[in-house]
Every structure is written in C-alpha cells, then in structure tokens.
C-alpha cells in the first residue's frame, strides 16, 4: 500500500491530533497520506499530506482510515462509493457500533494493513431514489438507512408500501425506516426494529409510532424492490433523510424506491473483538 486516504472528524481536536500523528507515521514509512481540503486547513503540519476535494480523496487510495465516530464513517463510505476500498474505522466517538477499532489498535492495525494481513467484512448498501411525476429527482447510496419522517406539525403520514410490486400495507405512522443490517442498530433500533447481524443479506422496514399497533417491523430479502408512495395534505411537511446526513423535502405523491446497491462497504475487522462483544458492550447487556 502506497497511498492512504484519511477522513477525520474535523471539529474534534482529538481526531485532528491523531490525524497529524498518523500522517507523520505514514510518511516515515514511505506512504503518502491523502486528506480532504477542509481537513488539511485544520492541520498544523500539512506538508506531508496531499489534499483534494472530498469526492476525489479516495480516487486511487489503497486504504481509507476513518478517525471519528459512526457518522464520520458513514460519510466516508458514501464518498468511497463504487471503489470497494477497505476502510479501517477507528472509534474516537461515543457509541461506535461501526468504528470498532480502538485508538490503541490504530498503529498495529495499520501495520497489518500495509503488510496485506487483514480481514474485511462486507456490509450491504442501499440505493434510494425519489420519483416525482414519473421522473427520478434524487438518487443516493446509503449504508445505514432511508428514513421518511413527518415535520413537527404534520399529521400522520399514509405510506403505501409494496415489495416486488406486491402490496404490503399502507403504514399510517409518523414515518418509516428502511434499514440495512448495518443500520439495524441505529434509528431503527430506537423504533423497536430488529437487530440484524451485519453480514446478513436482508432489509428491514420499521414504522415510526404507527397508528395501528399491530404494524410491526418486516424483514424482506436483500434483492427486494421496495416502493413507498406518500399521501398527505399539501400543507404538511414530510422529509426524506439518508444515513442521517443527507435530506430533502418530499411532496405528496412522491414515490421512494429502495433497492440493494451493487457495491458494498468493506470494513476491516478488529482482531480483538467480535460483533457480539460489540453488541454486549455498546448496549450494556448483562449490566445492572
């Protein structure tokens, strides 16, 4: 590996300090670090790193290192896009279901990556589009979830949902979460959605505060085509949020289409813990 892209939480002094140390450590080993321009402006020593626009940082990188929390990783995963580059995610945040590498593991983990000695877990992603009057007006790839949510003063939304062109139900709820297994421990979990092992190939559909109490989360096959048609009064506000980071206002009659993405996010595994240990630790299972 000769080129490593670094994404860091730019408003976190700790992440900036670690990024500076890592850039120097890599330079001493003949490895070029590549950082985003807005990150480069916040680093004190930038001569050892190359910088470019966020969308180009991973263009020809051999590895991506993420320094921050799950939000930083999710943003990086979208920018990596179709390149299938392995991502080493280091947890400098709080919860960190996805960033399972600890700071103490950073340099040993990078050493192994440079030597080609690492394992990856592949996380499925979703493609979400918004169709308006027969035309696609938005198209995005997501790692965690696609969320339809009503505004503060809006009434319950009618969301006519079909799977593979077969009618499922019309959810009458505050919103709907369509999640990957990776995203099942995010917003979906707060809405009583199922916890899905991240290596499963499936999609969960979870209503938010449904009017009908028997509306429960539904899990469908990963290759399913999910279509959600919205119906609500024109003076109400309904929003689409992708991975909690990209959003847009929806209109009544819009159809949100969701399918499995062609590419995956490749996360480097921690050598010191497995997924169930992460669950126990983060959710504090077994504690009183």
Swiss-Prot record:
Keywords: ATP-binding, Cytoplasm, Kinase, NAD, NADP, Nucleotide-binding, Transferase. The active site is at 70 (proton acceptor). InterPro entries: ATP-NAD_kinase_N (IPR017438), ATP-NAD_kinase_PpnK-typ_C (IPR017437), NAD/diacylglycerol_kinase_sf (IPR016064), NADK (IPR002504). It is found in: Cytoplasm. NAD(+) binds at residues 70-71, 144-145, 155, 172, 174, 185-190, 245. GO terms for biological process: NAD metabolic process; NADP biosynthetic process. Belongs to the NAD kinase family. One of its GO terms (molecular function) is NAD binding. Its EC number is 2.7.1.23. Its cofactor is a divalent metal cation. This is NAD kinase.
């Amino acid at each position: 590996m000769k080129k490593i892209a670094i994404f860091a939480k730019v408003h976190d002094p700790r992440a900036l300090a670690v990024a500076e140390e890592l850039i120097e450590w890599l330079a001493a080993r003949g490895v070029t670090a590549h950082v985003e321009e807005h990150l480069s402006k916040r680093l004190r020593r930038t001569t050892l790193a190359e910088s470019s626009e966020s969308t180009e940082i991973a263009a020809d990188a051999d590895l991506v290192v993420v320094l921050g929390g799950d939000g930083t990783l999710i943003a990086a995963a979208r920018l990596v896009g179709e390149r299938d580059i392995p991502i080493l995610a280091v947890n400098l945040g709080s919860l960190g279901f996805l960033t399972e590498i600890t700071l103490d593991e950073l340099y040993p983990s990078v050493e192994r990556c440079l030597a080609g000695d690492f394992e990856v877990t592949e996380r499925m992603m979703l493609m979400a589009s918004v169709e308006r009057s027969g035309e696609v007006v938005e198209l995005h790839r997501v790692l965690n979830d696609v969320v339809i949510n009503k505004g503060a003063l809006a009434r319950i939304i009618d969301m006519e949902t079909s799977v593979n062109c077969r009618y499922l139900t019309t959810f009458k709820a505050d919103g709907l979460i369509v999640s990957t297994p990776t995203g099942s421990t995010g917003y979906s979990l707060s809405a009583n959605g199922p916890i899905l092992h991240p290596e499963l190939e499936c999609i969960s559909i979870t209503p938010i505060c449904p009017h009908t109490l028997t509306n429960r989360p539904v899990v469908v096959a990963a290759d399913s085509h999910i279509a959600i048609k919205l119906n609500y009064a024109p003076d109400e506000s309904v929003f689409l949020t992708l991975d909690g980071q990209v959003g847009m206002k929806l209109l009544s009659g819009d159809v949100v289409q969701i399918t499995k993405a062609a590419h995956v996010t490749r996360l480097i595994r921690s050598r010191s813990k497995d997924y169930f240990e992460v669950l126990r630790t983060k959710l504090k299972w077994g504690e009183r």
